[in-house]
Amino acid sequence: MSRFMSPRFAGLEAYTPGEQPQDQQYVKLNTNESPYPPSPAVVAAISAEEVSRLNLYPDPTGRVLKEKLAALYGVKAENIFLSNGSDDILNFAFMAFCDSERGAAFPEISYGFYPVYADLYHVDCVKIPLKEDFGVDYRDYCNIDRMVVIANPNAPTGMEISLAEIEEILKTNPNRIVLIDEAYIDFGGTSCVDLIRKYDNLLVVQTYSKSRSMAGARLGFAIADAGIIADLEKIKYSTNPYNINRLTLLAGEAAVESNAYYVENAKKIAATREMTTKRLREMGFTVLDSKANF
């Protein structure tokens, strides 16, 4: 660390990404990359003609992609927020909805970036232990008066909480954001997106990195009440309005149009998970009931 670093960050423990093999011959199971390539439509969207337009700035609003995602999820474009991977959205959420007086709560065993963001913004956080069966006890998050952050399905356990349990958390924390990180939702979980019509404090975050086979493109999106989306847009436009490049936007649009391709791939991955689980249990191992791709 140099002598120029602010004392605020002197003790910060940064997130450590997993090693990225340079020969690109492997699928990294530890980061849950998809073994399948992007859809043919996505590959076709990155044409030489579009590459030649990289001298132009991308659309900071991502209007076309927002409209396509809104149609896919049955919401309005004003309910969609786009960013450079779901990590970016998590970052903005901690920045926008937490401070020294408004804390956060999340499972003790979960995605490693949650405590990093809490430390980065000096947010008082409560790390709640899992149950003995490694599940999340939703009751621990009721009436907690903090921003609640839950990965559903959870990583690294793959276990999920029900919509009824999420709804109870929302009801009992009406003045705090409830962020549900659905990075692995397409592998067998039940999305809570429909609940945004009922609860204006729900923020659902998804990614293109897992089921949509675009980890290298860096694209994530959130679905929430228009007011929450406006808050996130304010943070985005105060930091980097052009945080999604032109080619990623085009790839994202093509991926929505070829959604059936990704649904089928997710089914194959889930089937492999179930087969592996069955074999391991037959060998005497204890395996959690995962709804993720692991």
Predicted feature descriptions by range:
Residues 1-56, 144:
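N-terminal "arm"/small-domain region of PLP-dependent enzymes with the aminotransferase-like
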Residues 63-103:
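Phosphate-binding glycine-rich loop
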Residues 85-98, 162, 180-184, 188-189, ...:
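Glycine/small-residue-rich loop that forms an oxyanion/phosphate-binding "nest" at active or ligand-binding sites
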Residues 96-151:
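PLP-dependent aminotransferase-like
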Residues 131-186:
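Active-site phosphate-binding strand-loop segment of PLP-dependent enzymes
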Residues 201-281, 285-288:
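PLP-dependent aminotransferase class I/II
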Residues 288-294:
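Short Gly/Ser/Thr- and Asp/Glu-enriched loop/turn motifs at secondary-structure junctions
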